[in-house]
Design a protein with these regions (language model features):
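N-terminal, intrinsically disordered, low-complexity segments
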Residues: 1-73
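Extended, hydrophilic extramembrane loops/domains of integral membrane proteins
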Residues: 59-93
Length: 94
């Protein structure tokens, strides 16, 4: 039996710091997939946008990450090997 679904493994740490306001999945996750053609597209999916200057924090659920991937790639199966929630901290470098 063959499946048309592609399997992507994701791993996120509990705390992640970013230095730019537009946050993509590639900024906050480690990813692995046997089909290397879809990884670049998944890494560029924007998941957050910080609008204020200074330090800001946001808690991001892995379910929101899976939802964002499925919007663009509905046939991709996601397996989370990391934290269920990720705290993303934006540190404005200006």
């Amino acid at each position: 039996m063959t499946s048309s679904r592609k399997l992507v493994y994701i791993q996120g740490d509990r705390d992640v710091e970013v230095t730019h306001p537009d946050v993509t999945l590639g900024d906050i996750l480690k990813m692995e997939c046997a089909d290397r053609k879809i990884l670049p597209g998944i890494k560029t999916i924007r998941i957050l946008r910080f609008r204020s200057r200074g330090t800001r924090r946001c808690v991001l659920s892995v379910l929101r990450i899976i939802e964002a991937v499925h919007e663009k790639y509905p046939d991709v199966e996601i397996r989370n090997l990391g934290e269920p929630d990720i705290i993303v901290t934006y540190e404005d470098q200006r």
